Each structure stands twice: as structure tokens, then as C-alpha cells.
Design a protein with these regions (language model features):
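An edge-strand/N-cap motif at the start of beta-rich repeat modules
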Residues: 34-63
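Short coil/turn segments that connect the beta-strands within blades of beta-propeller domains
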Residues: 39-40, 80-82, 127-129, 184-186, ...
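Short, conserved, GDST-rich strand-edge loop motifs in beta-rich repeat architectures
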Residues: 133-149, 236-251
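A short beta-strand motif characteristic of beta-propeller blades
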Residues: 60-66, 103-112, 161-169, 204-209, ...
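Blade-loop segments of beta-propeller domains
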Residues: 65-95, 99-123
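Short glycine/acidic-enriched loop and turn motifs that connect beta-strands
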Residues: 91-93, 137-142, 195-196, 244-249, ...
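Blade-level signature of beta-propeller repeat domains, shared across WD40, Kelch, NHL, RCC1
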Residues: 338-372
Length: 372
């Protein structure tokens, strides 16, 4: 199935056309076409003043990057993989690490005096000259705390100064917001109730996509996937699981969707009843993997993105907090997070292979594939 915004011609129209696109998933590309090699390095935040660098090929920690503050709670990598952004545990300070030299090139905070400013979310412009930041401040007064309204800022990464305040669309303050830039940096996409495209220079609204509307007549509300993957098939295109309500049967469904931000197009295909499964894309874009986690019961899932189906699922000895990542060469699956171990499984059979034990507990992980 496919759905475009009003005024655009859908790639495929109507529910009855679902079978016609079963083997035409947008964005399925080979590993070589994505520019990724067959190895990757993991940058791991932990409770020390270091970021660990773990190499998939050797399964060893190959470097340690000193950082100024302990407990790197969140790590992000720039689109060109040349910068690592390290967030402190108080959501107040960001340190910038140059890759591959692994040297700190600066840090900044918006907190000052009795005012603490929390950085709730941010996105760096492709030029790496500035970032959009969603922040909120708290000021300690003599008899109380004053909590300011959430604000979106334009922050200059050369001067470390706020250079503009980005107005809220419709002058309506939101309690949460996430961002993406278009590949050319001309548009700033804001994810709120709607998907709003702003001119990245003037911050004027240039387009809007009501992503809460049903994609087809008779279908219920559908939550679209916008999660980023180290093996994202192309800029501005996101593949993942969606969930929707079937109003006729009064049930929740789950399926696979590919979303094109620039074209405002969606290709989707329901695959069965909704279950609480995560999703991550394979390096070649033809498969997806997920985890189902319930108290005392854990499953690994595999999705065939060409035939739009569940290709396999197996119960295994998981952990209450965990994440899954495929290896860059596509032969292994890693179970990690919330601890100091990485469990390695065979991608084809789900067979457990071995456990790698680190000397630190992970707080955040970002995977950076080597260039192809």
C-alpha cells in the first residue's frame, strides 16, 4: 500500500493494490550502494571519563577516548561520521569529539548561575556549523523554582552562542519535539503532532504533513517509523515497523513501512497482529531485526523486507533491558546494553555463539560503519 500527501500522485493507490507492491520495497539497496564497509566501530558511553571504541572484526576494545565529564549518557554521530557528540548525565553539557582523531575539540552548556538549561533534543545541520536544540530552563529563586516554557534555539557551533530562537509553528508550544534536516540542509523537519518542514534559514513553514491522519479511507491512525539506523538505506528515507488500528475489527495491526520525507510518500504493508517488537535495519537493507521483551519472556525476530513477512522468531535467554544490532558484514546479531556484555548470535540460525565481556557498563552506544 502507498499513501502520498494531498496533491501528489500516490505510487500505488488503494488497499487492493497491496499485493502489487509486495516485492517493491522502496529503498532496498545493497551494502556497497550505501557506502558502508564490512566492519564497524562501536562508540560506547559508560560511567567513567572515557568513551570505549569497540571493533566488530576483532571483538576487542581498540581505543579509549578521554572525555571531560563522567557518565556519557547520550552519544550521537554527525551525518558524515566526522564528529561525535557526547551528552553529560544532566542533559546540560555537550562535548564534541573529532573522528577519526578521537580528540576533543570543545564543549558547551547553556546553564549559567542559578539557571539550569536542559537540552532535551538536538540535531546538527549537515554543514556542522550549527544545531537546532529543544531546551527548557529552570531557575532557582529565593523561595521557589521557575520553570520556563520549552524553546527551540539555533546554536552556532563555531562561537558556541545562541544566534536565533526558532518560533513554534502556529505559536503553539509543544512539550516535546525532535528534528531531522533534509540531506541538503535546506529544510528542518520538526516532528510534533504533524511533520512540519521549516526553511532552515528563515525558519518559516514551507510545508506540513499530517502524519496522524489515516493513510487510507477506513484505516485508523497510524504511527510512522522515523528511527535512524547506522545502515539507513538513503538520506531522508526511513524503514521500520508501524502500528495501526483496524476500526472494522477493533484490533491493532503491525506492519512494515518505508517513509520518504521529501516526497511525503509512504509504502506500507500489514504483516499481522501488533506485538511489542523493536526494529533495526540490516546492512544491505533487505532484512530487519527486532526484540520482543516481556517479563520472563524474550524473543528475537527477523523480517524479510522483500516479501514483507516475518522470516523467523525464536525465544532466547534475554535480559530486561537490551538492544539488538546486526554486524556490518550481516553474519551476526549482537545483544547489548544495560551491562558490560555483548552476546553474539548467528544471523541465519539465531544460534548463540559467545559472549564478549567489557570492563565497563554501557550507558549509550552509537555504531559507525567503516567506509566502503
Amino acid at each position: 500500500m502507498a499513501r502520498s500527501r494531498p496533491g501528489r500522485t500516490p505510487k500505488v493507490a488503494g488497499i487492493a493494490a497491496a499485493a502489487a507492491i509486495a516485492c517493491a520495497l522502496s529503498g532496498v539497496r545493497t551494502l556497497e550502494a550505501q557506502g558502508n564497509g564490512r566492519n564497524a566501530h562501536w562508540y560506547m558511553g559508560n560511567y567513567s571519563n572515557e568513551v570505549l571504541v569497540w571493533d566488530e572484526a576483532t571483538e576487542k576494545v581498540v581505543d579509549r577516548i578521554p572525555v571531560k565529564r563522567p557518565i556519557s549518557l547520550r552519544l550521537d554521530v554527525s551525518e558524515d561520521r566526522s564528529r561525535l557528540y557526547v551528552m553529560d548525565p544532566f542533559f546540560e553539557t555537550i562535548e564534541i569529539i573529532a573522528l577519526p582523531s578521537k580528540e576533543s575539540i570543545g564543549e558547551f552548556t547553556l546553564s549559567e548561575g542559578s539557571t539550569r538549561t536542559w537540552i532535551r533534543s538536538f540535531q546538527v545541520h549537515p554543514s556542522q556549523e550549527w544545531m537546532a536544540m529543544f531546551v527548557q530552563s529552570r531557575t532557582k529563586l529565593a523561595d521557589r523554582y521557575r520553570i520556563d516554557e520549552p524553546t527551540i534555539l539555533r546554536f552556532d557551533l563555531a562561537t558556541y552562542e545562541v544566534t536565533d530562537t526558532i518560533p513554534w509553528p502556529d505559536e503553539e508550544t509543544r512539550r516535546s519535539a525532535n528534528f531531522r534536516f533534509s540531506p541538503d540542509g535546506d529544510l528542518l523537519y520538526m516532528f510534533t503532532d504533524d511533520l512540519i518542514a521549516l526553511d532552515s534559514e528563515t525558519f518559516e513553514e514551507v510545508d506540513r504533513w499530517d502524519i496522524t491522519e489515516p493513510l487510507e479511507p477506513g484505516l485508523g491512525e497510524m504511527r510512522l517509523p522515523f528511527g535512524q539506523s547506522p545502515y539507513q538505506e538513503e538520506d531522508g528515507v526511513y524503514t521500520g515497523l508501524f502500528r495501526m488500528t483496524d476500526p472494522l475489527q477493533n484490533r491493532r495491526l503491525m506492519g512494515i513501512a518505508t517513509v520518504d520525507l521529501a516526497g511525503q510518500d509512504v509504502e506500507f504493508h500489514p504483516i499481522g497482529p501488533s506485538e511489542g517488537v523493536s526494529f533495526v535495519l540490516s546492512p544491505d537493507g533487505t532484512k530487519g531485526y527486532g526484540l520482543k521483551s516481556e517479563i520472563g519472556h524474550y524473543e528475537m525476530w527477523k523480517f524479510d523486507l522483500l516479501d514483507r513477512r516475518v522470516a523467523g522468531r525464536i525465544a532466547f535467554a534475554g535480559r530486561p533491558r537490551m538492544a539488538l544490532m546486526p554486524s556490518a558484514d550481516g553474519t551476526k546479531l549482537y545483544i547489548y546494553n544495560a551491562g558490560s556484555t555483548i552476546d553474539i548470535y548467528d544471523e541465519e540460525t539465531f544460534e548463540f555463539l559467545r559472549t564478549v565481556t567489557l570492563d565497563a557498563d554501557m550507558t549509550s552506544v552509537v555504531v559507525v560503519p567503516d567506509p566502503g
